Amino acid sequence: MARSRSNQIGGQPGKINSPRTDTLTEKFICDGGEIKTVKARDLFLLKGNPQLNKDHFTFSKNSKYPYFTRTVFNNGIYGYVDYLDEEHLIKGNSLAVGMMAMQFFYMEHDFYAGQFTKTAFPLFDGFDEKVALWFISWFNKSSKKYLGVLVRDFENEFYETELLVPYKSGKIAIDFIRERVRELEEERVRELEAYLKVAGLTDCSLTLAERETLNNLNSGG
């Protein structure tokens, strides 16, 4: 059951406060939005992944399907593989987690996975990469707690995780989440570009890949 909170969302996602994001939140509240404390079990379904060792796959830089493992590098993706079968294929637009580091990553496309991994599937409409970053920040904030329990107890610990989620008219405020995450991403890029200028590296600019890496770091990945 969700509990309403009248206060703003402080420091999430990305643990950054700025006048722009604070103003965005204030406007959201004034327009009838509210912040609710919701347990993960109300928003996600956690499933163990059908697992296959990497020896079962053919890896290639031109392959289509990500192979997700316990690594925390490259968004948990060990490499890309050719299609194998439907039995082991995991639906994308979901959150994958490796049980060793307990770090969550957004998986846009259908994927295969190795041992000791699970996937959280959203139970609500409108889920995408921007919305995923919001929830990843909360789940990764709980990584130390997850690491402190036995693997067999992780599912219950995950479902009991409390999340602050914006709601409007009885539904998750997807548009607000996307806008706020976008503002936070832009804020971090401005901070880094300001640092480069102070450091005398004004001829440097961030590539698209570097911006994506920065956003992943901001989300706790």
Label for each model-derived stretch:
Residues 1-52, 58-75, 168-221:
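Non-catalytic DNA-recognition/assembly elements of restriction-modification systems
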Residues 164-166:
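A short, hydrophobic, proline-anchored segment that marks a local hinge/packing element in signaling
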Residues 36-162, 221:
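DNA target-recognition domains and sequence-specific DNA-contacting regions of bacterial/archaeal
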